[in-house]
Amino acid sequence: MDVRQSIHSAHAKTLETQGLRNEFLVEKVFVADEYTMVYSHIDRIIIGGIMPVTKTVSVGGEVGKQLGVSYFLERRELGVINIGGAGTITVDGQCYEIGHRDALYVGKGAKEVVFASIDTGTPAKFYYNCAPAHTTYPTKKVTPDEVSPVTLGDNLTSNRRTINKYFVPDVLETCQLSMGLTELAPGNLWNTMPCHTHERRMEVYFYFNMDDDACVFHMMGQPQETRHIVMHNEQAVISPSWSIHSGVGTKAYTFIWGMVGENQVFDDMDHVAVKDLR
């Protein structure tokens, strides 16, 4: 488990390129036949990837000591979106088939969660966010046909994109975790511009569906102290509540966003005008 401490905005603005990457970038999300796990002190979110290829993968009791529990989801809820080939997730003996861009919410208290791929040639890639939970909500599969989509932006401003809301109150009930998938239209490069902050939630972005020769310049920092982190395919970045979170790519791309905090109101944000950015 890779533990990332919280960081004050006054400290963050003093960091050079590698310092910013060390604090906020999750460089390797998927490793064959393993799980990756990054624990952030910011709202206690855990993020990572699970890619079963030749065997099943599960998060066992080895994380219990680090989390102060006897099993992974004893006091946590889990959200998973599959960006790879078809797979299965078995929760306490109940098997769910999770295809490409299907998702599964797993409620607090699930003791055994096992991940598998159906075809080793095209393995599943399960990207997950995990957050503290105060009660148990039912485990539920969500397909792309069931999400709450919103299309925003314009080709003229190069920010035409569709926001697919997987885990939001309109779709299912969670304790605090919200997740969704945003896909830019071909030829569009900007996400979340004009940008915003939200003091009541932190966020994690996971960029994917990118060519090897492409990158995204992920914008972060306070609106008057902006910085950037260069992102490549299948990398994630942690965004504290004091930071903007926006990006521009060399080509169109897709990203998964995950939020945890004190509410789940999607529009609870503090907008920042482009003219006010520095």
Curated annotation (Swiss-Prot):
Cofactor: Zn(2+)
Binding site for Zn(2+): 196, 198, 203, 245
Keyword Plastid found: no
Name assigned to this protein: 4-deoxy-L-threo-5-hexosulose-uronate ketol-isomerase
Function text: Catalyzes the isomerization of 5-dehydro-4-deoxy-D-glucuronate to 3-deoxy-D-glycero-2,5-hexodiulosonate.
Keywords linked to the UniProt accession: Isomerase, Metal-binding, Zinc
Functional pathway: Glycan metabolism; pectin degradation; 2-dehydro-3-deoxy-D-gluconate from pectin: step 4/5
GO molecular function terms noted in the UniProt entry: 4-deoxy-L-threo-5-hexosulose-uronate ketol-isomerase activity; zinc ion binding
Entry superkingdom: Bacteria
One protein family per Pfam: KduI
Source taxonomy: Bacteria, Pseudomonadati, Pseudomonadota, Gammaproteobacteria, Enterobacterales
Reactions accelerated catalytically: 5-dehydro-4-deoxy-D-glucuronate = 3-deoxy-D-glycero-2,5-hexodiulosonate
InterPro entries: KduI, KduI/IolB_isomerase, KduI_N, RmlC-like_jellyroll, RmlC_Cupin_sf
HAMAP family: KduI
Protein EC: 5.3.1.17
Complex formation: Homohexamer.
Family designation: Belongs to the KduI family.
